Amino acid sequence: MQKRITIFDTIRGFTMISMAGFHACYDLAYLYGWDMPWFTQSVFQDIWRASISWVFLFIAGWMCTLSHNNIKRAAKYALAALVVWLATTLVSVDDSVNFGIIYCMAACTGIVALTDPVLKKISARWGMPLCLVLFALTWSIPKTTYPVPYLAWLGFPSPGFVSGDYYPIIPFIFMYLAGYFAAHIAQGIDKTVPSWAYANPLPALASLGRHALPFYLLHQPIILGILELVYSVR
């Protein structure tokens, strides 16, 4: 039985706590009207958001090289993305989540699963930096609108498209692939996982990181529930 790569569980655990903090600040600022200019009127919000989503995508790309069934992983992510879309559409607290981070992970995992034989022919030492360059070059593509309907999933939103969390395939497939190629670099010619990947310096965070998907699905309803409870008794 393959040992679990605990260092990524630890990183995920830390990132999940950061994500919960980010969404708590978002809710307080945009749903409860708190005056938080450091969050709403500065680049800090974008940096914080990127530090969460980019880590998730990079690690997911790395881990797909170790998965026995990436099609199954993609289907699990897709089901979770559907749940998020339904919940945010039916419960109108904020904009519904169309093509959010979980959708992106589902799409990227599915794409890699189907193209893995081709991707393996690309030198990882060239593939990783190339993907990072492509990520930077395509970063602004989904930040404008296009007079073409039904392509928001790819990265070309139409003028009427709205989403509370938007991570289309372009440019984020390239961050995912950067993780994929980084894994192949680290594994080397013999395809073994490096020893540092089994480090477990913070077991509590590693334990949290092993349950990233359920944590993602539940943390925002819990935060909103706590805030509603606090405000109802004030």
List each model region and its residues.
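Alpha-helical transmembrane segments and their immediate juxtamembrane cytosolic regions
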Residues: 1-234
